[in-house]
């Protein structure tokens, strides 16, 4: 899609869309009218597409037929082009042109002269009788010769000019196909066809022989004739000059298919008219093969498509062992059947032998590589190569070298080299003698010459550099190397120098050296920008920043040095913490960063190692040795001490340093630095000075990887080398410093972990090691009192008490959390490194905040805007990767914001107020605003959420509410000089810098936040996801962190390590159900959505930040352990009075036996005899299957690349997953790309469930459903009448068959009992108190394997509706009853795929189907949702007609109209797990099809659910236009010659399964480890295609044949033989299975039960003894009649459809007992 089209697609205004559509319609209406002038003929779609390639528009309204319309249209277009070149006011002579075509030239008939003569017999009919040898008389300067030049000789053309002195310029159209020079078929078969004979070839426009033109092969010389002169003029144009001109020049102006426009003019002798170098006619896809056999006629003679050759070569090389038979089969597979006629069988045999020959050659390179050679070996490489070439020329090439020469094909170009030709006559029409060798020789020589220069450049490269893999050395060796290169380069030609320059630019970074100058102290983000264009950087490019300048380090990467009074006394460089990387064992490594690349002056890398250079420095001059390498000391550098100090350590801590410069990609495996020279337990400092790399650590419990960038450093703690190993990989060229010490530098782990991390600007209060100063000492209880719950506490120090008093705290005694003392205040030790802002430089509205900060013992510091963070946020906004409001703004405005974010360089005053929730961070600000109303108009308050904005408005009612805004609205509104960013940790990363960049009037930014709470989360696709949070960015400006709260009492605050003001109150409760009134906090968005739908006030743990609530309910479920500490702290710090915990996550008990696990199952099926289960544990024996002989041969296919196309086209997980509004689905499973192609729909996927509910479920009240039923009675009657007519339903109403009903009930129960135990353990649905109309909805778990859904965008899943079990058994009984009734009247021409085997369907297709006419198939849009009231009326009408009792129908209608779910009452629709789901879908499908179309008895049709296929595309009923509006069901008809039905393809040879479908399903089963479970069923599906033998070539295309072969191979490898599909149905019928297992068993069958007796029964002839009571002589038939009458007379109105009514309906209504007798 073009950019303009994308802009139009973004139009959303309906009026604009309508205007755009109208403009498109007008343009489409005008263009065909213009096209009719050139293209008045109707063309087929392939012809129209071909013409459009030539820039010719056709009209869809053209109706005039023509035998060769496309060719004629091209002819007209050529004349139109010529008309643009002709002079408008001068007369032109038109030769061989019909008068009816004068309009194509854009000229008037009276203006020009027509000179037509007979050149061939058909010209007599065109132009009248003229002398065939006459020459046209031309009295004008310009002339046009139409479609005749190809019949003329150069002498005739010369004669035309010589007889007409006034003729200067001639436009001629030439019709000759360029492919005829190579005897190739037509390049444009839709326009013309070609046939080749001995001396001639035929050009057939449109493939119509009646309009064919026959040419001799000699006429093709016109395609390379650029100049025509007199006889022998090429030898001497002076001895035999022309009368008027020296020669004629011919220029090719245009080519369209075989039509060419030639421009011929006189050329004077004094004019130097050079020949063009080449004429190009068409792009070529044809090639010839090199000669590999002797004699030459044994080689491939013909020309073949390049794609065909390459595909065959790759096929032969990719198959493990290819045979000649495989090659022939592959050729048959890749060549279309209609194309076979143009190939010579003899040449195909030669072609197959060519492929077989090259496949047997060695495909592994036998050339040597200098990569592993030493310096001497590399210098001798060129000598060895020359010797090898010399001996190969004498003794013959190696197999690999020969293979390289014969695999490259010889291109056949559709070009000509223009020539000078003599004006000959009859000789012109003789066939030229083409020479392949002369045509290809110049190209071969050029190729050989080019390869020679390339090899020379390669050898010189090796000699000059000495080592290909050697990194950049110091500058001392560069002049010598350069001089040598210049001396050798002087011997090369110009072309050699050019080639060598190109090679060295790409291969050797030293020739010429690729240098990139970087300004000192460049920030990291600037360095990254400059290195994007050169990803493979040398170390000189990225490590030119000197540590000698650390004394002048600015704040925040500024280019201006700070003042003297702001510099650190210990030269401590400003650093940031990039992250903490925990190991599996609990060890943590903190990575800090200078934010830029660094370099120590004076480092000289002299030691060469594999993949790196090194230098070693030590204070005592001692060297360093380890396995394989040894380093001598180069002394010590002053810059090394500065680097140690910059990392926060004392210089005396380390006395040795190893400097290493890594090449890109070099690595060091896992090892430990346990040399004896170093004491055990010593610390090691590693500085990644420049470049990128990964540092892996491994212990016994797992591995962790650290990503290192420019300026990163970290320390391996004491004892690390004894417990861990580490490795290094250089992602880019990398420079590193490793500091060690030979004396003990480790310290024992302190018992007082209060030391502040030197590199954290403001530490986490939860980490007691981040305290500044010694506030208290953690003491452990005595050994004798280990059970004591409160630790020893020390008084709070004076600075802490003072800070607490300033914030209104009176609880000044120490508190604890049960294990250790809580610190109320955490001071920032490094705050003195920040530069303070000057109050006098600020505007008057900002100055009161300086006094406020001073009163709180806080400072206001200067912050330089971070352009990298600002640009990342604004770029994400512009690209619609973050936010909902801002991306919709004007694109120009967003672009200007991005530009400001990139370029704004200014400092802003920052006041950072950090504290716990309820610490009073914003209280002082609000009091200041209340006391100074004039300040309210000079500030803006920016908040992350609407809830927080409402909180500010409530606390400042006198303030203009427009001054309080969310962060996205803040970007749109005007700015003020002071901006308060409340709870700024929840703002997107980079927003603060971006806002300050685009709002240039902001002088003071006040930041309030809590670094212990959760921060803003962003998707991974955005740039800001890689940035550190705002808290981490600005915490360095916070003087202290106030870890105390006024909000919560000690009972709630101390457990989360917060000092509390309130000593009393607070409660922690536990409940089993969620309370009604309190706010509910849940861990996941999906739970929040569900509770909100139920009317609860719910928020997520992280989303409640900023709120204060009295009472709070926190739900604990399976997602709670996944939440971070920050998120849990946020949730626990919200409540001020009580927290109620509700545990909703319960463990599932182990499954029990069937009856014990489901207590209601016994009462439900107590009357089903248990002896039906006898023998169920006896496995059925597999039938003996004989081998089926192979009837055809399919070429071996490569199994590794079959799914590559879909894998490459597949989008990433985040793009494919569906967004439910709260979270994404989880349909893409595992890391296997093949498995990822298949969506895995799972019942536990809450996001998918929500999307599926929205897509599949419709809601309506019972009243609305009843109203719809009344309004659609006529529609239901129409459906039934059409159904009855087509399905031959008896006209009389059928009586109720009690015996059939009982039999169907037995079938339903047996099927139910045959299910797995897990399916039966649905105790709730068997509960008698479970409402009859209640439905449980859940997702269907499945792997989606449909062809159109594999690798495609994900869609909603399928729902399963779980009814009460007795309801299901009753409706299933009804469905089975109706099925049996339907089978009694179903016509033979209708096949319903229900309880039918594929063999039966195959027989139906083979014996009845008509493939000689177009077939019809149809799909539906939302079929289940469209089974509404009209179809329910049809079902009830049909069931009533077939004798189903009214009480059953009333109950069925009730559950359809009163279906209750957790969402509410459902509309009338089809639900899965209904009893009659499949049967009702099928019947409704038949009825709809019969109502819409006229279906006669001659139509064969197959139906199954919503699938249908017919062998005839029937006429639509005339009344359908009036009936269509009655139905919401919409069909998508398709008339095709390749019908599909239920996954089967219907063919003349029978039904077959799609091999692509089978292959994909097998691949999924293989990767899931389930192949043994599915291989037999897949083999049965595969069998139908396997049995066809050679006929599969008529059914499958090339891709399907490959998949068929791979399926065959997979099944054979898994031990499968061709199975028998069998004639039995795979239904759950225990009785039939027993008969298979024990053929001696006796079957006793009645209408009430089917039983199997393993032993011969003992029969008593007269069981009832003679007595005094009279015997009942009533006939059984009359008893049955009485029972049925009693059942049918049961009033439907008496049914309440609740309680045990369904139980009575199912158990007693037709058992011969009254429902009321119990």
UniProtKB/Swiss-Prot annotation:
The keyword ATP-binding applies. It catalyses: RNA(n) + a ribonucleoside 5'-triphosphate = RNA(n+1) + diphosphate; ATP + H2O = ADP + phosphate + H(+). Pfam families: 2OG-FeII_Oxy_2, RdRP_2, Viral_helicase1, Vmethyltransf. InterPro entries: (+)RNA_virus_helicase_core_dom (IPR027351), AlkB-like (IPR027450), AlkB-like_sf (IPR037151), Alphavirus-like_MT_dom (IPR002588), DNA/RNA_pol_sf (IPR043502), Oxoglu/Fe-dep_dioxygenase_dom (IPR005123), P-loop_NTPase (IPR027417), RNA-dep_RNA_pol_alsuvir (IPR001788). Residues 889-1042 form the (+)RNA virus helicase ATP-binding domain. Residues 59-223 form the Alphavirus-like MT domain. Residues 1413-1520 form the RdRp catalytic domain. ATP binds at residues 915-922. GO terms for molecular function: ATP binding; ATP hydrolysis activity; mRNA methyltransferase activity; RNA binding; RNA helicase activity; RNA-directed RNA polymerase activity. One of its GO terms (biological process) is DNA-templated transcription. Residues 467-496, 556-568, 756-773 have a biased composition (Polar residues). PROSITE patterns: ALPHAVIRUS_MT, FE2OG_OXY, PSRV_HELICASE, RDRP_SSRNA_POS. Disulfide bonds: none annotated. Its EC number is 2.7.7.48, 3.6.4.13. RNA replication. The central part of this protein possibly functions as an ATP-binding helicase. This is RNA replication protein. It comes from Shallot virus X.
């Amino acid at each position: 899609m073009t950019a303009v089209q994308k802009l139009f697609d973004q139009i959303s205004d309906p009026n604009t869309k309508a205007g755009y559509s109208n403009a498109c319609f007008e343009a489409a209406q005008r263009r065909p009218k213009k096209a009719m002038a050139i293209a008045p003929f109707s063309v087929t779609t392939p012809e129209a597409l071909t013409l459009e390639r030539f820039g010719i528009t056709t009209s869809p309204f053209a109706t005039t037929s023509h035998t060769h319309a496309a060719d004629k249209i091209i002819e007209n277009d050529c004349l139109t082009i010529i008309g643009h070149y002709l002079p408008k006011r001068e007369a032109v002579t038109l030769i061989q042109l019909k008068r009816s075509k004068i309009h194509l030239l854009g000229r008037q008939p009276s203006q020009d002269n027509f000179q037509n003569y007979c050149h061939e017999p058909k010209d007599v009919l065109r132009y009248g009788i003229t002398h065939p040898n006459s020459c046209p008389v031309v009295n004008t300067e310009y002339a046009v010769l139409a479609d005749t030049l190809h019949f003329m000789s150069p002498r005739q053309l010369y004669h035309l000019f010589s007889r007409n002195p006034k003729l200067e310029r001639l436009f001629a159209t030439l019709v000759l196909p360029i492919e005829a020079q190579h005897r190739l078929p037509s390049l444009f078969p839709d326009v013309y066809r070609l046939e080749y004979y001995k001396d001639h070839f035929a050009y057939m426009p449109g493939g119509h022989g009646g309009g064919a033109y026959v040419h001799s092969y000699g006429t093709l010389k016109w395609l390379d004739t650029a100049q025509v002169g007199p006889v022998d003029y090429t030898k001497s144009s002076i001895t035999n000059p022309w009368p008027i001109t020296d020669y004629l020049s011919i220029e090719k102006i245009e080519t369209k298919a075989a039509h060419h426009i030639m421009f011929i003019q006189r050329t004077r002798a004094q004019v130097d008219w050079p020949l063009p170098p080449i004429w190009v006619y068409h792009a070529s896809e044809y090639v010839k093969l090199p000669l590999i056999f002797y004699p030459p006629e044994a080689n491939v003679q013909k020309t073949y498509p390049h794609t065909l050759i390459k595909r065959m070569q790759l096929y032969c090389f990719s198959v493990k062992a290819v045979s000649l038979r495989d090659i022939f089969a592959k050729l048959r597979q890749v060549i279309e059947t209609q194309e076979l006629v143009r190939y010579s069988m003899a040449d195909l045999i030669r072609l197959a032998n060519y492929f077989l020959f090259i496949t047997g050659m060695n495909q592994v390179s036998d050339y040597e590589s200098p990569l592993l050679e030493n310096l001497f070996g590399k210098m001798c490489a060129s000598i060895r190569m020359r010797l090898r070439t010399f001996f190969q020329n004498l003794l013959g090439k190696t197999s690999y070298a020969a293979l390289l020469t014969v695999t490259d094909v010889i291109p056949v170009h559709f070009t000509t080299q223009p020539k000078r030709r003599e004006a000959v006559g009859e000789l012109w029409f003789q066939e030229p003698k083409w020479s392949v060798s002369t045509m290809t020789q110049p190209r071969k020589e050029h190729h050989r010459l080019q390869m020679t220069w390339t090899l020379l450049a390669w050898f010189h490269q090796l000699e000059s550099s000495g080592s290909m893999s050697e990194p950049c050395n110091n500058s001392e060796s560069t002049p010598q190397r350069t001089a040598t290169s210049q001396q050798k380069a002087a011997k090369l030609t110009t072309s050699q120098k050019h080639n060598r320059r190109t090679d060295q630019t790409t291969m050797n970074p030293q020739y010429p050296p690729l240098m990139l100058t970087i300004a000192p102290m460049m920030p990291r983000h600037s360095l990254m920008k400059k290195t994007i264009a050169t990803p493979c950087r040398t170390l000189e490019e990225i490590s030119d920043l000197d540590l000698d300048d650390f004394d002048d380090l600015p704040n925040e990467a500024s280019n201006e040095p700070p003042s003297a009074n702001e510099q650190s006394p210990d030269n401590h460089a400003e650093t940031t913490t990039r992250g903490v990387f925990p190991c599996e064992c609990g060890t943590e490594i903190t990575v800090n960063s200078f934010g830029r690349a660094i370099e120590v002056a004076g480092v000289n890398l002299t030691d060469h190692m594999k993949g790196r250079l090194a230098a070693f420095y030590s204070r005592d001059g001692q060297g360093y040795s380890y396995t394989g390498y040894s380093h001598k000391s180069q002394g010590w550098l002053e810059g090394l001490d500065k680097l140690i100090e910059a990392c926060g350590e004392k210089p005396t801590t380390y006395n040795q340093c190893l400097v290493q410069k890594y090449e890109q990609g070099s690595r060091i495996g896992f090892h430990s630095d346990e040399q004896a020279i170093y004491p055990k337990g010593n610390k090691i400092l590693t500085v990644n000075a420049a470049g990128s790399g990964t540092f892996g650590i491994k212990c016994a419990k797992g591995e962790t990887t650290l990503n290192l960038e420019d300026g990163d450093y970290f320390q391996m703690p004491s004892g690390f080398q004894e417990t861990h190993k580490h490795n290094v990989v250089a992602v880019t060229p990398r420079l590193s410093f490793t500091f060690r010490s030979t004396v003990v530098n480790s310290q024992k782990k302190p018992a007082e972990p209060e030391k502040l991390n030197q590199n954290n600007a403001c530490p986490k209060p939860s980490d007691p090691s981040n305290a500044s100063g010694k506030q208290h000492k953690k003491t452990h209880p005595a050994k004798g009192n280990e059970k004591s719950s409160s630790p020893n506490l020390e008084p709070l120090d004076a600075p802490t008490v003072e800070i607490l008093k300033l914030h209104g705290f009176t609880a000044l005694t120490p508190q604890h959390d049960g294990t250790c003392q809580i610190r109320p205040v955490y001071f920032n030790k490094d705050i003195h490194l920040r530069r303070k802002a000057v109050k006098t430089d600020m505007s008057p509205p900002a100055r009161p905040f300086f006094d406020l900060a001073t009163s709180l013992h806080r400072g206001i510091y200067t912050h330089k805007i971070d352009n990298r963070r600002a640009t990342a946020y604004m770029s994400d906004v512009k690209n619609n990767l973050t936010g909902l409001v801002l991306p919709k703004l004007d694109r120009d405005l967003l672009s200007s914001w991005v530009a400001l974010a990139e370029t704004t360089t200014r400092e802003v005053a920052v006041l950072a107020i950090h504290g716990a929730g309820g610490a009073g961070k914003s209280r002082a600000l609000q009091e200041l605003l209340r006391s100074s109303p004039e300040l309210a108009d000079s500030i803006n308050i920016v908040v992350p959420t609407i809830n927080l904005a409402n909180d500010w408005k409530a606390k400042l009612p006198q303030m203009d509410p427009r001054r309080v805004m969310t962060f996205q609205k803040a970007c749109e509104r005007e700015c003020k000089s002071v901006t308060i960013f409340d709870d700024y940790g929840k703002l997107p990363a980079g927003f603060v810098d971006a806002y300050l960049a685009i709002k240039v009037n902001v002088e003071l930014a006040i930041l309030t936040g809590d670094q212990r709470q959760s921060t803003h989360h962003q998707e991974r696709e955005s740039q800001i996801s890689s940035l550190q949070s705002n808290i981490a960015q600005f915490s360095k400006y916070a003087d202290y962190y106030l870890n105390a709260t006024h909000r919560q009492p000690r009972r709630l605050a101390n457990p989360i390590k917060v000092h509390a003001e309130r000593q009393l109150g607070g409660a922690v409760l536990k409940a089993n159900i969620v309370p009604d009134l309190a706010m509910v906090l849940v861990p996941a968005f999906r739970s929040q959505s569900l509770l909100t739908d139920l009317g609860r006030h719910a928020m997520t743990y992280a989303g409640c930040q900023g709120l204060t609530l009295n009472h709070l309910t926190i739900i604990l479920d399976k997602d709670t352990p996944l939440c971070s500490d920050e998120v849990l702290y946020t949730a626990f710090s919200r409540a001020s009075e009580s927290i109620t915990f509700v545990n909703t996550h319960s463990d599932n008990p182990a499954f029990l036996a069937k009856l014990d696990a489901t207590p209601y199952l016994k009462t439900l099926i107590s009357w089903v005899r248990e002896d039906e289960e006898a023998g169920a544990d006896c496995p059925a024996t597999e039938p003996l299957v004989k081998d089926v002989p192979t009837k055809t041969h399919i070429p071996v296919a490569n199994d590794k690349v079959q799914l590559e196309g879909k894998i490459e086209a597949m989008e990433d997980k985040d793009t494919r997953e569906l967004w439910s509004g709260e979270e994404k689905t989880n349909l893409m499973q595992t890391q296997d790309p093949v498995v990822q192609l298949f969506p895995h729909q799972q019942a536990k996927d809450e996001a998918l469930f929500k999307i599926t509910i929205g897509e599949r479920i419709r809601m309506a009240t019972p009243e609305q459903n009843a109203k719809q039923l009344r309004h659609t009675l006529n529609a239901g009657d129409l459906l039934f009448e059409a159904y009855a007519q087509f399905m031959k339903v008896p006209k009389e109403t059928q009586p109720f068959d009690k015996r059939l009903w009982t039999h169907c009930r037995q079938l339903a129960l047996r099927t139910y009992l045959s299910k797995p135990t897990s399916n039966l353990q649905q105790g709730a649905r068997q509960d008698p108190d479970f409402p009859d109309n209640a439905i449980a909805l859940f997702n269907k778990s499945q792997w989606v394997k449909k062809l159109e859904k594999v690798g495609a965008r994900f869609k909603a899943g399928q729902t399963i509706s779980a009814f009460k079990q007795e309801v299901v058994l009753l409706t299933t009984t009804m469905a089975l009853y109706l099925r049996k009734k339907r089978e009694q009247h179903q016509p033979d021409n209708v096949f319903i795929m229900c309880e039918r085997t594929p063999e039966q369907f195959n027989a139906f297709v083979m014996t009845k189907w008509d493939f000689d006419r177009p077939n019809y198939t149809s799909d539906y849009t939302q079929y289940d949702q469209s089974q509404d009231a009209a179809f329910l009326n049809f079902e009830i009408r049909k069931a009533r007609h077939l004798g189903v009792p009214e009480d059953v129908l009333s109950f069925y209608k009730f559950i359809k109209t009163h279906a209750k779910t957790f969402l509410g009452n459902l509309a009338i629709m089809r639900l899965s797990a209904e009893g009659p789901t499949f049967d009702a879908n099928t019947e409704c499908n038949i009825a709809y099809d019969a109502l819409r179309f006229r279906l006669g008895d001659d139509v064969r049709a197959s139906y199954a659910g919503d699938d249908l296929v017919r062998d005839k595309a029937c006429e639509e009923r005339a009344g359908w236009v009036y009936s269509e509006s009655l139905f919401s069901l919409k069909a998508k008809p398709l008339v095709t010659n390749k019908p599909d039905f239920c996954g089967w393809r219907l063919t003349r040879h029978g039904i077959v399964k799609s091999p692509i479908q089978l292959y994909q399903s097998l691949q999924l089963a293989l990767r899931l480890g389930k192949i043994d479970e599915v291989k037999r069923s897949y083999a049965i599906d595969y069998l139908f295609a396997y049995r066809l033998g050679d006929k599969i070539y008529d059914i499958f295309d090339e891709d399907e044949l490959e998949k068929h072969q791979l399926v065959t191979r997979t099944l054979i490898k898994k031990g499968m033989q061709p199975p028998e599909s069998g004639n039995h149905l795979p239904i759950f019928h225990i009785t039939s299975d027993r008969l298979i297992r024990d053929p001696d068993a006796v079957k006793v069958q009645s209408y009430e039960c089917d039983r199997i007796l393993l032993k011969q029964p003992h029969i008593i002839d007269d069981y009832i003894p003679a007595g005094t009571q009279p015997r009942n002589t009533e006939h059984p038939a009359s008893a049955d009649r009485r029972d049925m009458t009693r059942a049918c007379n049961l009033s439907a109105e008496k049914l309440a459809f609740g309680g045990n009514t369904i139980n009575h309906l199912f158990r007693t209504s037709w058992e011969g007992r009254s429902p009321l007798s119990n």
